[in-house]
Amino acid sequence: MKEFDLPPDGAEELRALLEHSGAAFQREGNRFRLRFASRGCQWQTVCDCQGSLVLVYGIHSARVAQRERALELCSELNSRAVRGSFFLQEERIVFRTSAQLTERFEARERIAAALEYNAAVLSSQWERIAAGAQGLVLPRNPNTAGPA
């Protein structure tokens, strides 16, 4: 196979994207850690690269105090998420998206889209997730636009 026929390497494409954008990140093999900030919220994002697949995990900063309510909220948010899913991991609510890289010419675009969607969903649901982690219920605002 010629090099252009091979699927892109997710770790190398993500590294190039982050370096080009000027984002600060830490790399440990095929795992990348970076901080995101939007709408006054800050959180950690972890990307795991598995060949041509890049998994993006946005980790909400609130510790879960009420596990049952947090799981209910994850289920509720998952019913509306277009791409990706919410789950509970180590007392944190996490939103996972992914980018499957098939062509080199669009690899960085796909990774950027997965990162942007992850950040948009997490920031648009920030207050609901923080409340849900504490066992509280915030009503959904039907006028609030958001991916989830």
What spans do the regions from the language model cover?
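A short acidic/glycine-rich loop-to-helix N-cap element
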Residues: T102-A114
